[in-house]
């Protein structure tokens, strides 16, 4: 027969009271590779677990393996079929051709229209790969953890009743488990685990506990060998089942023939007006459900629900007891309340939709649990729908049941009610007859069945009741202790943090006071030190402030006091060094630790004070420098002095301060190294743990792969062996479902690969389970002790840290685990079980008794195995939970300590970094200040140089503009003067000789060419000077810039070295030298730009003075000549020769001079010039004595005029240098500085400095150039005639008159430049008249030389000869001093000059175009050929030579 789908059963394990888990419990734990869910107190129907709903989580076995194991499963398919359900590594089912029992009905074979129905199954592995045994109800709504699921079921349909045959016999249907079989509960926890059972089931047999989630093996399912008899054959079992089926059918037929009474009247009496059911008679078979009136208490409701779920067999047991015992016995032994004993057992009634069952009595004593009733009876509800009754018991298959629908079901339930209430609805007159029929032989079997169930139920409830309070008390005590410990630790930690903060503030204040007292003492001691014997202290020692430990004049008592109060004492230093070298060792006492801490804090405070002092000094220095710069506008001299270096180095000079700074940085370095070592150690530990876990995981994977290969090989070997695999398994390794199959296969006598695989899988699963059990037990024992030791150590460490080494370690004691309960209770309860009465000797009674005993033994064995499994699971779960709780707490404590240590280390690290950062910031600020000062100095110097350069450029531009204006103005004046002279000469034009006209024309042409060449040379000279000045300035500026860059680089290097030396106290002297050099550099810089300006000003002043004098002389000469030419006070000869000799030579000389003379002319205003001309004109016109000053003007003008080029040729034809003597005379004159300032033109080596341009030596270059175009136009005949005529005229005049001046000039030309010209004896006072003039510089000497003979024949002429009136300049020598000075002109002189001028004017019209004078606007040929052509002229031709030289100039 098959299981009935609508039969229900309750779980025999009660769930724990629901309680919300703590956050610490929800935390996921990992220990030994086991993962457990924290939601172990929440319960859901097992169907959700089986279906893999959202609340279902994998079991511990699934978490351990992470893959399905190759083990046996009894849930191969929805129905019985061939095939072995073996799991491979992919999770798929491997079918094999062997028969296997299936206790789960297919979901498709159930009815779709029925409400929630629960089926019974024996499951080791769920269909959906859930490895924990559980019930699988039909899909439907789930109820809460404390709400019974039977209310909706009872309210939707009438309760099913068993047949009368089965009720009389008390036997279950064949092929179905009995009512005492204890399946798993319908509500499973969220993690897939069942609630742990008892721990004292070990006395029922040699069953070993195993892990939750691991499948049952053959050893678990089989009967122990020592208590097991030889299993009957398959034929005997089939015969027994067939006979029982026939007896059941016969009993049902007999029951159906009995008279029946309609139950309608009885049902109407059982219901109240309010629609609520009310039972007036005790009905043990009626289930006790949770009422909706709310009279249950929370704890009592929990316990009743747990007890109800523990005893799923109470329904059938109570019903069997009511049928076995009489009404009087039932009322007296079970209820003992206000039930009427005369009415007997009331008939059961069907409940309609929406109805609910009421308690047994009105006062609810049975529901609350009467103490007089046995345990598990009064407080539990029973369900008449026992698991022993299935659909097959009534001859209805599931398929037919689904097809017939509601009518067939209604008829079926009516037959059940009729058979069930047969003996209860008969009238009172037939009571004795019904009583005789009820008391039959099968009732004795029901009594045994009921007593056995009661014993087990009572024992289970008692053990549960004894265990739950103790476990709850222990758990509660542990949680309270853990909570109190954590609260105490947190409170202590907060107190310590607050105390530490306050203590730190107090220490800081105390250290500051000590330091202030120490500073005051040092200030008081310092005057004594300075006033003591010995040499006076140096200036550097006085500026260092506090110098602890360096005083040599302090008395011993005061020195000892300073050493004791100084933070750098030797004892503290030794202690600190020892602590730094051994960081894990503690100090001798707490007082020493406090002293060390104070010393470190004082050192940090000293460092802070020193930095503040340095910052203050730096700000003062910067403020002083800023004020000095703003006040003076230049750099202060003390900016780079040694005072700044001393101020920086002085605070670090004391030895104790340096020592403490070194110790502080050493301590910080040790601290950082210690933190790095700690982090490395933690990383190594974590790496080792991960490596070990990885190795274990790899080993497990390798074992699984090897297991698969071995299973395959063994299966192939067993396939060849055939039936030997079945015989080797033995009877002790076979389960309930496998016994008949194995025997059937033995009888068939054939083997297959599926048989071998099945047997091998069973054996391998058993070995694997044993190995894992041993590993689990060993790991539990080992890690339990390890965790206890770790917990004790961590708690002891916490106490030592929080309360000190003298504190007690009471909190480290952990509550001991409860000892496992002994099995004496179970044995006593089993001993009290009443013996089964003797059975009748009839065949039917024997067979029924034998089958019942067999079924009872099997169920008992399975129950014992399941109880032992629950016991081991409960113990392991409790130990695991306890271990994980304390392990998590210890880990949390360790993590908190590590984080706190890390936070303190990081705080100290930040403090040290802040100190170093502040020091670096100050150093950077100082460097920035120095750099700013240096950059400002460079910027000011650059600005000054740029300003000077711009001013110089402006001056040069103004100078060029002034030169241009002067040149243009001078040219205009010259043109006006010569145009006026030309006009005067045109009015007085007369017939003159041709040579004189040509001579006059040559003079003017030469003057124009000289003016042109002088302008070109002046422009070239000015450009060259400007280029020289620019190049010189550029070179000087580049040199200065390079020097500044080199000095800046050296300065930066010196600053960096000085900064390092200041910190290390090693470079004080080098810093002082560097700052002295920096101080001297700014002092020398301002004087450098002034030097070129001063030199330029000196040159300009000298040029102005010299130019002014020269311009004044030149202006005087021109003004006098204009006056004489206009007034006619001098002779015509004198007026005609004066521009030729004096004015023209002076103009040429002034034109040749440089830009100095032209620049000076710009300073002469037109008003001053006009006033000067008017003054000279008035003096000459009135004949005042002051007019004689014009002689000095002539003298100055003629003294400055160098000899003409014709005078450079001697009478003998030899050329002698004459520029040296003339230069000597210029140096002796007052205008010599003007000529000395004239620069030397580059490339002219023969040019003597200080001489005009025409005094240079022509050299051989004079003969290399070709003849000018003007000379080529003249014919050779004209040249010879001109020379001959000129020579004759001059010789005749010289012989006739004997001009003393001409002879003197000739003698001067003959003697040379180095010889002095002797004073020629001149008759008639001629020598006396010329005595006022230097040799060769008599006025008109240049023009008089034109008439000299080049052959020197007149050298020895008589100077006493008279002066002819027709000679041009002879009357000048013969005249008196007044006439020589220009104040009076003789008539003879005027007549002679007039005659000569007339001849010249009369001769000019008769000449052709070739001999006509060249107009002024068209000067002669230009270029360097002019000066070279003069050199090629013949040297011995007198007037012709002079004419040629003047023409070329």
Swiss-Prot record:
Residues 1-32, 123-201, 258-298, 315-437, 523-551, 1257-1278, 1399-1449 are annotated as: Disordered. It comes from the Eukaryota. InterPro entries: DUF4684. Residues 123-133, 315-333, 384-394, 426-437 have a biased composition (Polar residues). Residues 1-13, 400-419, 1258-1270 have a biased composition (Basic and acidic residues). Signal peptide: none annotated. This is Uncharacterized protein C1orf167. It comes from Homo sapiens.
């Amino acid at each position: 027969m098959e299981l009935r789908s609508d039969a229900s059963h309750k779980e025999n394990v009660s769930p724990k009271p629901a309680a919300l888990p703590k956050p610490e419990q929800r935390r996921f734990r990992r220990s030994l590779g086991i993962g457990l869910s924290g939601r172990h107190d929440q319960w859901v129907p097992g169907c959700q677990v089986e279906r893999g709903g959202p609340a279902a989580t994998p079991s511990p076995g699934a978490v351990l393996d992470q893959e399905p194991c190759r083990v046996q499963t009894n849930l191969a398919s929805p129905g019985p079929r061939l095939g072995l359900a073996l799991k491979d590594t992919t999770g798929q089912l491997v079918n094999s051709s062997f028969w296997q029992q299936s206790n789960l009905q297919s979901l498709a074979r159930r009815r779709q229209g029925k409400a929630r129905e629960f089926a019974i199954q024996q499951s080791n592995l769920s269909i959906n790969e859930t490895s924990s045994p559980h019930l699988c109800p039909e899909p439907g709504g789930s109820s809460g953890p404390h709400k019974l699921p039977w209310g909706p079921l009872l309210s939707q349909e009438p309760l099913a009743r068993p047949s009368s045959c089965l009720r009389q016999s008390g036997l279950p249907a064949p092929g179905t488990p009995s009512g005492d079989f204890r399946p798993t509960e319908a509500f499973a926890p969220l993690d897939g685990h069942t609630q742990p059972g008892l721990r004292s089931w070990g006395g029922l047999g040699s069953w070993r506990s195993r892990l939750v989630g691991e499948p049952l093996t053959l050893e678990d399912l089989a009967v122990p060998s020592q208590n097991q008899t030889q299993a009957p054959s398959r034929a005997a079992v089939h015969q027994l089942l067939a006979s029982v089926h026939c007896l059941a059918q016969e009993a049902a037929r007999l029951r159906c023939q009995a008279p029946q009474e309609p139950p309608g009247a009885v049902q109407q009496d059982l219901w109240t007006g309010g629609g609520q059911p009310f039972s007036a008679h005790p009905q043990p078979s009626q289930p006790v459900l949770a009422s909706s009136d709310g009279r249950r208490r929370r704890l009592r409701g929990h316990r009743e629900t747990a007890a109800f779920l523990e005893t799923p067999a109470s329904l059938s047991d109570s019903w069997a007891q009511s049928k076995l015992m009489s009404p009087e016995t039932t009322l007296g032994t079970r209820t003992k309340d206000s039930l009427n004993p005369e009415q007997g057992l009331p008939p059961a009634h069907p409940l309609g939709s929406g109805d609910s069952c009421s308690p047994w009595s009105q006062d609810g004593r049975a529901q609350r649990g009467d103490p007089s009733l046995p345990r598990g009876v009064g407080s539990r509800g029973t369900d008449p729908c026992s698991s022993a009754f299935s659909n097959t018991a009534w001859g209805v298959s599931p398929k037919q049941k689904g097809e017939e629908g509601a009518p067939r079901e209604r008829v079926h339930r009516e037959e059940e009610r009729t058979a069930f209430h047969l003996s209860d609805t008969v009238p009172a007159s037939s009571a004795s007859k019904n009583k005789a029929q009820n008391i039959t032989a099968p009732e004795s079997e029901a009594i045994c069945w009921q007593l056995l169930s009661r014993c087990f139920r009572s024992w289970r409830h008692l053990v549960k009741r004894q265990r739950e309070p103790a476990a709850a008390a222990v758990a509660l005590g542990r949680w309270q202790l853990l909570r109190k410990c954590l609260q105490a630790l947190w409170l202590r930690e907060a107190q310590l943090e607050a105390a530490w903060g306050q203590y730190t503030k107090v220490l800081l204040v105390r250290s500051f006071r000590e330091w202030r007292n120490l500073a005051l003492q040092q200030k008081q001691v310092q005057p004594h030190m300075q006033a003591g014997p010995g040499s006076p202290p140096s200036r550097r020692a006085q500026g260092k402030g506090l110098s602890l430990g360096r005083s040599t004049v302090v008395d011993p008592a005061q020195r000892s006091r300073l050493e004791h109060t100084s933070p750098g004492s030797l004892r503290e230093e030794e202690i600190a060094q020892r602590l730094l070298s051994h960081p894990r060792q503690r100090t001798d006492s707490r007082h020493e630790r406090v002293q060390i801490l104070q010393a470190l804090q004082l050192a940090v405070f000293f460092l802070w004070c020193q930095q503040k002092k340095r910052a203050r000094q730096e700000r003062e220095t910067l403020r002083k420098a800023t004020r000095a710069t703003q006040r003076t506008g230049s750099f202060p001299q003390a900016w780079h002095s040694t005072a700044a270096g001393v101020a920086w180095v002085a605070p670090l000079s004391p030895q104790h301060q340096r020592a403490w700074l070194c110790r502080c940085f050493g301590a910080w370095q040790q601290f950082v190294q210690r933190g790095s070592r700690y982090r490395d150690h933690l990383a190594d530990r974590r790496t080792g743990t991960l490596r070990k876990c990885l190795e274990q995981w790899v080993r497990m994977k390798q074992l699984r792969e090897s297991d698969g290969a071995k299973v395959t090989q063994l299966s192939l070997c067993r396939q060849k062996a055939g039936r030997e695999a079945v015989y080797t398994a033995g009877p002790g390794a076979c389960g309930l479902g496998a016994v008949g199959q194995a025997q059937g296969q033995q009888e068939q006598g054939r083997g297959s690969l599926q048989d071998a695989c099945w047997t091998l899988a069973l054996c391998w699963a058993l070995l694997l389970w044993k190995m894992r059990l041993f590993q689990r037990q060993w790991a539990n024992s080992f890690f339990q002790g390890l965790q206890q030791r770790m917990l004790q150590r961590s708690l002891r460490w916490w106490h030592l840290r929080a309360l000190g080494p003298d504190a007690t370690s009471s909190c480290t004691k952990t509550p001991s685990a409860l000892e496992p309960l002994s099995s004496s209770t179970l044995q006593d309860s089993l001993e009290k079980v009443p013996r089964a009465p003797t059975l009748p000797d009839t065949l039917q009674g024997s067979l029924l008794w034998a089958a019942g005993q067999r079924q009872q033994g099997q169920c008992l064995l399975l129950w014992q195995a399941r109880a032992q499994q629950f016991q081991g699971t409960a113990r392991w779960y409790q130990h695991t939970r306890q271990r994980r709780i304390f392990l998590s707490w210890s880990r949390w404590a360790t993590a908190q300590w590590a984080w706190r240590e890390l936070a303190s280390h990081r705080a100290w690290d930040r403090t040290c970094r802040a100190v170093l950062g502040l020091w670096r910031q100050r150093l950077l600020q100082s460097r920035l200040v120095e750099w700013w000062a240096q950059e400002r100095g460079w910027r000011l110097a650059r600005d000054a140089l740029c300003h000077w350069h711009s001013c110089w450029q402006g001056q040069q531009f103004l100078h060029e503009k002034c030169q241009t204006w002067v040149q243009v103005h001078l040219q205009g004046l010259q043109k006006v003067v010569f145009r006026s002279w030309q006009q005067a000469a045109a009015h007085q034009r007369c017939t003159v000789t041709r040579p004189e006209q040509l001579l006059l024309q040559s003079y003017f042409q030469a003057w124009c060419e000289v003016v042109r060449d002088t302008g070109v040379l002046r422009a070239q000279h000015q450009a060259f000077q400007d280029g020289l000045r620019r190049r010189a300035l550029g070179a000087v500026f580049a040199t200065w810039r390079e020097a500044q860059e080199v000095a800046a680089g050296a300065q930066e290097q010196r600053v960096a070295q000085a900064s390092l030396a200041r910190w290390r106290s090693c470079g004080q002297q080098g810093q002082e030298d560097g700052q002295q050099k920096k101080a001297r550099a700014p002092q020398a810089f301002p004087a450098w730009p002034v030097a070129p300006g001063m030199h330029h000003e000196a040159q300009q002043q000298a040029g102005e003075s010299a130019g002014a004098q020269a311009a004044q002389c030149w202006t005087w000469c021109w003004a006098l000549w204009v006056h004489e030419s206009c007034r006619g006070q001098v002779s015509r000869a004198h007026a005609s020769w004066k521009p030729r000799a004096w004015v023209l030579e002076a103009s040429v000389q002034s034109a040749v001079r440089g830009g100095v003379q032209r620049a000076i002319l710009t300073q002469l205003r037109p008003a001053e010039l006009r006033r000067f001309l008017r003054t000279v004109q008035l003096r000459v016109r009135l004949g005042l004595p002051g007019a004689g000053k014009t002689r000095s003007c002539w003298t100055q003008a003629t003294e400055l005029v160098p000899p003409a080029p014709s005078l450079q040729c001697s009478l003998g034809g030899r050329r002698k240098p004459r520029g040296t003597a003339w230069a000597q005379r210029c140096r002796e004159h007052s205008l010599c500085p003007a000529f000395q300032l004239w620069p030397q033109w580059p490339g002219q080596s023969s040019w003597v400095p200080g001489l005009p341009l025409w005094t240079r030596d022509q050299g051989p270059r004079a003969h290399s150039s070709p003849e000018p175009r003007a000379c080529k136009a003249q014919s050779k005949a004209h040249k010879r005639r001109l020379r001959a005529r000129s020579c004759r005229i001059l010789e005749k005049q010289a012989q006739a008159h004997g001009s003393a001046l001409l002879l003197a000039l000739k003698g001067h030309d003959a003697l040379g430049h180095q010889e002095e010209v002797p004073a020629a004896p001149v008759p008639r006072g001629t020598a006396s008249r010329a005595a006022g003039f230097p040799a060769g510089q008599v006025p008109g000497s240049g023009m008089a030389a034109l008439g000299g003979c080049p052959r020197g024949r007149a050298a020895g002429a008589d100077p006493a000869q008279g002066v002819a009136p027709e000679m041009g300049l002879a009357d000048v020598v013969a005249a008196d001093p007044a006439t020589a000075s220009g104040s009076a002109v003789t008539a003879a002189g005027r007549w002679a000059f007039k005659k000569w001028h007339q001849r010249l004017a009369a001769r000019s019209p008769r000449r052709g175009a070739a001999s006509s004078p060249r107009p002024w606007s068209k000067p002669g040929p230009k270029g360097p050929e002019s000066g070279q052509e003069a050199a090629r002229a013949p040297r011995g031709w007198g007037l012709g030579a002079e004419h040629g030289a003047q023409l070329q100039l």
